[in-house]
Structures are given as structure tokens and as C-alpha cells.
Amino acid sequence: MAVEKVQAFEKVSIPTEKQPGSEDLGFDPAELQKKYEAERNLRIQNGGVSQYRSAWKSGFGYYLEDPNADANFSRDPISARYDVVIMGGGFSGLLVAARLVQQGITNFTILDKSADFGGTWYWSRYPGAQCDVDSTIYLPLLEEVGYIPKEKYSFGPEILEHAQRIAKHFGLYPKALFQTEVKTCHWSEEDSLWTVQTDRGDNLRAQFIVSAFGISHMPKLPGISGIENFQGKSFHASRWDYNYTGGDSTGNMTKLADKRVGIIGTGATAIQVVPKLAESAKELYVFQRTPSSVDVRNNRPTDAEWAKTLRPGWQQERIDNFYAITTGENVTEDLIDDGWTEIFRLVAAPFFASADIEQSLENRMEQVQIADFKKMESVRARVDSLVKDPATAASLKPWYNQFCKRPCFHDEYLQAFNHPNVTLVDTRGHGVDAVTTKGVLAQGKEYELDCLIYSTGYEWYTEWEQRTRSQVYGRNGLTITKKWSQGITTYHGWGVHGFPNFMVLSSAQVNNVPNYTHMVGYLSRHLAYIVRTCKDRGIKSVEPTATAESKWVQQVVEQGAARRDQMKLCTPGYLNHEGDITEKTDRLYSYNGSGDSKFQIILDKWRDDGKLVGLSIDCATEADL
């Protein structure tokens, strides 16, 4: 699909001529607008997300091979009956399992294609891997398992270890089937059960199935020619090959000392791994389409004395405080005090504050835009202060609004470009031209390499079958792929009409905040409540009504109108479907109600009411209602 080039801010009134008083701001909003438009239009390509390649559908399945698993693993097929089958063993699946256990439901199994729990953190073992949300709120169930993170932002090994700690604490290892991929899920009208079949020949029957695949598990590759022709070593960052590079998650990749290394991509993963590669490689070439916004991280060890003062409920208090700030509430204290809360105070706060005095949406968005300009000016100034070469610094400056891409925070990335062995290859928004037998062709020049690393991210809401390598068949054989062919439809972000007892955990149509584990943690309690309620009342199946689903989707789309208009103006990336904004992508937005219409308040009241409003209920007998 062709993507239009945008020539003006559609909903935000930014003057097209220099205005009196712009000198006080330190910048001219009109000139910044023009710069943003030019940078966006430079990068727009037709095709949206289809410009990327699916690793497993494009004949590049070897990029998906698990370097941490036993390649010779085998087991006999299993036939069993469960209350719940959980598909995914990352934090989403772990949280659902933990909440089920707390509800007294233990007859469930967890399936995962990896060889252990951890999800994203099982796969993301690249050097420097680290969470970008305060670890005391990102790592779930800290009080339940009795653990305090070592640093403000935990590194990958600690996060993976914590996932395993949760699994041990709740007795989940005996319930797990690892190195097992779901292939099909079929709903049976006869007995109101799901049949789940796997690549190991398993035949599992369950009353409920939970999709906890997560959003960062299927690597994607750039849609460029020649990937298969490269004669050197290549791998995706989520399948890091330490046998080739040497070292470990802390760096020290001694085997790269005589190697010319290239990395394609400058998103969140590259921000963390580039400094480690810069320390180890003989030569490092960073191929950039669009620079990330990189602000101060300020990581530091956890204060042991502070940890001793924590009282019961401390983690939920911190989670709630972060949630309040990032959803526009006025709070008296910022318990997290990091880059995220600063952004929301400076950029998003004007939107919510002006809503209280009944300003028009247009005026509120104008205030937000000015605040955004100010914040991004400081981010660009930071580049100048840290990068010595003026030309390199100019290429590393992000020219777009703060939330066009997920903001990054790091204290070594920009400085890495001061190393004499590091070269930034700025493709001026076009991306690399091709991969050759010897290296990478970019801007008409071939860069010869020994090793090429793809830091190109994961598939983000592509078609279900493509993203999960599985298919779900609901009532009358309807597939979830077909059901969602025109966009995701849910009720409260988890239930799907036509798919009884099918529960989805994702970031779409829920109150998606920067702390993903907070939202899946909240939803996991909600889903466990529904399962428990069905057991207690003798309910065989629950399914959103078509009306309830339709109304919820409409609310999401309507609330996302301002966000949609902003995303049209962004440089392409996964958050705006590579610039291809349609009604289908509108349905990926969060539910952003405020006040009594906040997502969590709505679901809290829904549970308190106890009537399962919006769901069709099929009971074993009328007496069970």
C-alpha cells in the first residue's frame, strides 16, 4: 500500500511562519515542523511492515535456531486434559500461571518453543541486554518471591534468573513443556473444550487457552537482497552466537579482536549492544536508517539501606505511582524518578492538565507539541555534548516527536562513536541497499565485513499465523487470522467474539504503559478471576458478545484519534506500522480512558459487579447461573 507524504501537522496548529516570542523558546516551531516533515518524507517507503522479511517464511529459518537449547532434545507425545493451556513461558505466561495458582487452579500446562522460562529474556542474551524500566517495577512478583534487584535497571542475566525464580517459587517447572511449538488450537462445540496440537505430536485438551506469546519473540529481517549470499558469519541479535564472538553478556568478546563487524539497525537492542561491540571489534560499522532518541539512563546499584526500609506492599505502591504519572494523574511524589516519568511530566502533562480547564483538544495538543519540541531539543543537544565529530553528531540527532519511537536511555551508546574503530554509516533514511558476498552495500559503497549482525527487531502485529507459526480455529472453523484480517477486535483487550474461552495477553486495546509487565500482571489477575469464577459457577464457556466487542473496539479507535494523527507525522517505525496508518492499525492502540473511565477502574468495577457483563455464558445447567 502506498504511504502518503505528509505536508502539514493535521490536528496540531503549529504556525507556518516564525512567530513573535519563538526566540524565548530557543527554537522556531515552524522550522522544526518543516525539518520533521522532511526527515519523515525522506524515509517513507511503500509496503509498510511488508518491507521486512519473516525469517521462517522467507527461507531464513536458520536465523531462528536456538543457540542455548539441546538440538538433540526429544520426548514422547503427550495426551492430557487440563483446565488451562498457557502458550508462552515469558513474564506473560508466568504471571498468568502464578495468579492461577493463587486462585487454587493448578491443572494447567505451559508450552514454549524455548528450552526454559524467560520469554524475551531467554532469547535476548546479547551483550549489554538490560531493561529500560526501573527494575523494582519491571521485575514482577518481587515481594512474593522475596527478591530485591541489584540495580535500578537490571541486566539480562538477572532478569532471566528472576523469571526462573518465579517458576520455581510457584512450582511451574513440572507443568512446562519446553522446546515445544503450538501448531493448531481447535474449539469443539460438542464438549466446549479446546484441542491443542504441537510439533511434538501432543494432543492436549483444555477448557481455556491463553495466548501469552508476547510481543518480542519472532525475529524479523530487512527486506533487502543478498542476505543469503553473505560468506561471513551472520546472526540476529536475539540469537547471539557467543561461540563466534567469545565473551558473555558483559562483553569481553575477544574473538572479535581481528574482525570487521557490521550491525544493521539502531533501535533499542543496538543502543545496548553497540558499546560492547565497540570495545571488542577491530572495526565496527553501524548501519543507520533513523537514529534513536537517546537520553540519560543513570543506572546505579540498589541502595541496601533503602531496601531495608521497605514495608509490605512497597512494589505495588511503586507500580501504581509510575502508572499514575504515565497516565496523567497528579501525584505529590515521583517514587521512580527516571527518564520515563520526566518525559510524561514535561510532555504529556500539559495535555491532561489543560483538560481540567476545558481547553479545546486543538489547544491542548498545541501545548503538548511545544513541550515535545523542547524535550527533543534537549535530546539533540546531548548528542552535541557527547559526540566529538560534528558530522557524526549531526547524523545521530533524532528529528521527530518523542513518542514516534520508544524512547531510549543509555550512558555509553553515543560515546561509542568517539572510538576510532567505530564508523556510523548514515544511509539518510533509505536503509542499506543490499548484502553482498563480502559485506554490505550502502549509499553506493561496499563495506567488507567478517561478521554481520541483524539488530532489526521483532515482528509487531503481523498476521497471527506468521507471527506465531500457529493457527487458532474458533466457532465454525473461523481462524483468528481471518477474524483479525481487518484489525484486532477484542473485549477489554483479552476476549474475542467467536473464540470461547480464548484469552489474549498483548499490548493492543488495553492501557498500554511503558511498563509492559505491569499491564500483563494486571490482566493476569483478571483472567485468573474469570477462570476461577467459571469453575465456581459451573460455567462451561464465556465469550464476548459481538456488541460488547464492537463497542470496545470503537472506543479504542475514537480515543486514538489524536494519537493517530500524530503517528502519521512520524518517521516510519514499528509503532506506526512503518508509516502505513490505516483503520486496521488504529485498532492496535491502547485504551486511554481517564478518570472513572481508566482501564483498570473499568475492569475493577466489572469484577466487583460479578455479573460478567458483556460475555455470553454457557452453563452446565440453568441452576448454575
Curated annotation (Swiss-Prot):
Pathway: Mycotoxin biosynthesis. Keywords: FAD, Flavoprotein, Monooxygenase, NADP, Oxidoreductase. Gene3D superfamilies: FAD/NAD(P)-binding domain. One of its GO terms (molecular function) is monooxygenase activity. InterPro entries: FAD-binding_Monooxygenases (IPR050775), FAD/NAD-bd_sf (IPR036188). Pfam families: Pyr_redox_3. The record marks 406 as: Transition state stabilizer. FAD binds at residues 112, 120-123, 132, 138. It comes from the Eukaryota. NADP(+) binds at residues 130-132, 266-272, 289-290, 405-406. It is an enzyme of class 1 (oxidoreductase). Its cofactor is FAD. Its EC number is 1.14.13.-. Binds 1 FAD per subunit. Belongs to the FAD-binding monooxygenase family. Baeyer-Villiger monooxygenase; part of the core atranone cluster (CAC) which products are predicted to catalyze most or all steps of mycotoxin atranone synthesis, starting from geranylgeranyl pyrophosphate (GGPP). The initial cyclization of GGPP to dolabellane is probably performed by the terpene cyclase ATR13. The Baeyer-Villiger oxidation near the end of the atranone synthesis, which converts atranones D and E to atranones F and G is predicted to be catalyzed by the monooxygenase ATR8. Of the CAC's other predicted gene products, the reducing PKS ATR6 might synthesize a polyketide chain. This is Baeyer-Villiger monooxygenase ATR8. It comes from Stachybotrys chlorohalonatus (strain IBT 40285).
